[in-house]
Each structure stands twice: as C-alpha cells, then as structure tokens.
C-alpha cells in the first residue's frame, strides 16, 4: 500500500523529485530560496524538519574521505565516483564502508538514503547487499555486511541473497532491521531472522529509476519505508514502537561481497532533525538511555566495561595507597615496640 511517511507530506516528495532529476547547484539554490532556508513544517502536530549538513552527504562529494577536515571517512574498497560512492564493485571478496565522523546527538531524526544495487549476476547469483548503521562504534570492518558483529546500536539491512536453504516464506531482496546492545550475533545462515525486528521484500536490483529508503526515529518509534517503484511514493516496510536508541552514535553504510557480487552504490545520505512536541508525561518517559533496547523484547544483558583511569586518577590511587601503606607500617612498629616493652616489664 502506498503511503506518505508520517508528516513528510508533499513538500519532501516534490523537493526530492526535483533533486533526483537535476542535481545542479542552481536548482538547489532555487529550492533553498523558495523555502527561505528555514525550517519546514511537514505535517500536523507542529513537526518541523531541519537538514543537518554535518550528517548529510550528496554530490559532488568534495573532500569525502580525504584530510582531517572531511566529515566522512571511506574504508576498504569504497571509492568516490562522479555520480555516486561505490561501497563495493561487482567483484568477489570486496568490502567497503562510508562513515560519518560526527556523532549524532539528535533526539528525533529522519535519514533518507538514495542508493543503487546493480550487477551482472542473474537470479540468486548476486550478493550480498548493503547495510545502514546508527552505532556506537565506527570504522570497524567485519562480517555483517562489512561491519563488525555484536555491534551496539541499529542496523538496517538490504539483503540481496538468501543464505537459508528451504527459504519459502520470504522473497529476496529483503529489508530487515536489528537493534543490538552488543550481546547478539547476526545469524548469516538464517539471514538474520532470529534477531530481526521486522522486514519486507524490496525488489531493488538493476532498476532504471531511483531507489530510496527512509529510516525515521521519533518518540522512540522506529519506521522504515521505501520508494522503489519509480512512483515517488513511500511504501511501508517496518514499524516498531518502543525502540530506545542512545544519542551520540554514528551514521554509516557498508557492504560486502563474497563468492557472489554486485555494485553497491550510495548516491546521497540526508539527515533531518525533526522537532516534535511532547507532553510532560512523554518528556518523563523519553529520557536518555545508555544502551539500545526494544520494549517487550528482552536482549541478553551485557556488562559495560569500566572506563580507563586517567593519569590524575591513577596518581591519586598510587599516592593514597602509599600513604596508607606507610601509615600501617608506622602503626605496626609502634605496636611492636609497646609489646616488647610490656614483655620486658613482665620479665623483671
């Protein structure tokens, strides 16, 4: 069923369609002037959106992955091209990632991902897909679509190859989501089914029009929708209430190929801050959390590692330990002398 995402409304659809057809700077300037470069109301309930450029990426990708001033880092086989950033080429055993260097402290947000997956492989002879991340750790290569296993945060997976044999319940490519507190492993053999929050079929390979994915996190409500039919309409995919994500994590995207391969391209990542009205009761309920979790879904507990001691703290510990040690020796000597003196008196 076609739908408009939450309070996105017609403004974002109109703007995105124009940007997709013409990526020129002049058009972007006209759009900004037309909107007054200010916040846009995107629906009822006094919800406004603000584009956060420090967490966004679009053409011409100037400075991406180069120098300490870049907001985005490349990893592995990822390459900056003129029209896209290629995470992995259509070659075997490749791995690449793109990570934002700035931690995100937004309370409510929306990430729009413009991507393309294509290659020479025929049916079920391509892989493996890509992932979009909001995690505590960044730039950590691993087996989960090019990222580390047992991650802490949110992972959204566009899985293009079914690993599980006798798979009849779902059609691939398939989008799924997972929240992890660092205790869970992604089950490749079962395509992540034991730990997924939900999912949907998404036919996204070798399409001749733009494909989009949106991840929306508002009032601890996670919504994932897609625009993959060339109709500029959002379709429901995943909706999960009670998702608790800490602030200060990093956005990124990654991909991996094995014996099978595909081109995995990212055209743009656009993060919007959403300002949402909350009642006093909601303010109390929506306090910051320190580990990701999902209501009504028990995750194995993990013991948070103790933070490393600073130099000053270590000095204080050593100093006071020495003071206590010397004090104990002095007290021991005094008690020993008194004991010897009493022993001599008894002897005489």
UniProtKB/Swiss-Prot annotation:
Motif (Endoplasmic reticulum retention signal): 344-346
Binding site for a carbohydrate: 93, 128, 161-163, 188, 258-260
Cytoplasmic side, ranges: 335-348
Membrane topology: Single-pass type I membrane protein
InterPro entries: ConA-like_dom_sf, Intracellular_Lectin-GPT, Lectin_leg
Record carries keyword Signal: yes
Subcellular location: Endoplasmic reticulum membrane; Golgi apparatus membrane
Residues of the signal peptide: 1-38
Gene Ontology molecular function: D-mannose binding; metal ion binding
Residues annotated for Ca(2+) binding in this entry: 159, 161, 163, 191
Transmembrane regions: 314-334
UniProt keyword terms in alphabetical order: Disulfide bond, Endoplasmic reticulum, Glycoprotein, Golgi apparatus, Lectin, Membrane, Metal-binding, Signal, Transmembrane, Transmembrane helix
Disulfide bridge map: 200-237
GO cellular component: COPII-coated ER to Golgi transport vesicle; endoplasmic reticulum membrane; endoplasmic reticulum-Golgi intermediate compartment; Golgi membrane
Segments forming domain L-type lectin-like: 49-274
Glycosylation sites: 181
UniProt KW Nucleus keyword: no
Function: May be involved in the regulation of export from the endoplasmic reticulum of a subset of glycoproteins. May function as a regulator of ERGIC-53.
Official protein name in the record: VIP36-like protein
